[in-house]
Amino acid sequence: MFVDCTASADIAFKYMNLFKRGYSVVACNKITISAPYKHYTALKEAAIEIGATLRYETTVGAALPILESISRSVHSGDEIVRIEAVLSGTLNYIFSNYAGGEGGTFAEVVKRAQDAGYTEPDPRLDLSGRDVLRKLLILSREAGVGIDEKDVEISPLLPAEFFEGDVDAFYAKLAENEAMFAARYAEAASKGLRQRFVASLVKDSSAPFGYRAKIGLESIDSTHPLFNLCGTDNAALIQTDFYPSPLVIQGAGAGAYQTASGVLNDIIM
């Protein structure tokens, strides 16, 4: 058994060789599972042919059984109708704590998240939405939808210019544009809405692969299950043909203990 708890691309792309040497793989490394679909399918097929096991529940939502629930639905003959999910504890912390400048500017809330250890060492990685994109690819593929990055509609949280320069320059850009963040917040709050960075996969016969996939900031009302999601929690709503009232999975989507327990469960399985 080989356990990959890194974020290394070098290690992630050695899984095929590990299979050939008789190892099964448990991974919380998202890189190879969200790689181009051609590589992903080759990896899965190789594991089956060789008789190895590849498990990666913790790549999405730490120990939350999001991927397992999707997989069980599909394997039972059910069909996914809609998945809506908040998959970044960092972004959820930021948007559940930012109040239009009251209690701190957007830049200050991001810095608090970094100081608390909720962000990557470089917080730009979190605010780029890249991590959420990878997680959406993984859960979509688990649902049997073979999408790549180009198939996802991406509404960037921040303009590309925010990511030029170093981290200090990034924080300076956030501070300079506080009025933009405050206006976004005020517009949503005036309608009784809250902002959440949402990843979704929705059945749509007119879309490629029969599903529409997107990530972006959304304003949701009080009837939505994601409305009261707070702190660093993740949540996923899974609606299927058999379950038109969606299954809601919610809880800590990150953390050393949570991730370790998920990895251990994959090892045992």
Question: Where do the model's predicted regions map?
Answer:
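Conserved active-site and cofactor/substrate-binding residues in soluble primary-metabolism enzymes
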Residues: 38, 61, 65, 104-108, ...
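N-terminal Rossmann-like NAD(P) cofactor-binding module of classical short-chain dehydrogenase/reductase
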Residues: 2-3
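Rossmann-like NAD(P)H-binding beta-loop-alpha module
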Residues: 48-51, 55-116, 126-132, 137-138
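Hydrophobic alpha-helical scaffolding
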Residues: 56-60, 84, 99, 122-130, ...
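A short hydrophobic/small-residue beta-strand
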Residues: 25-26
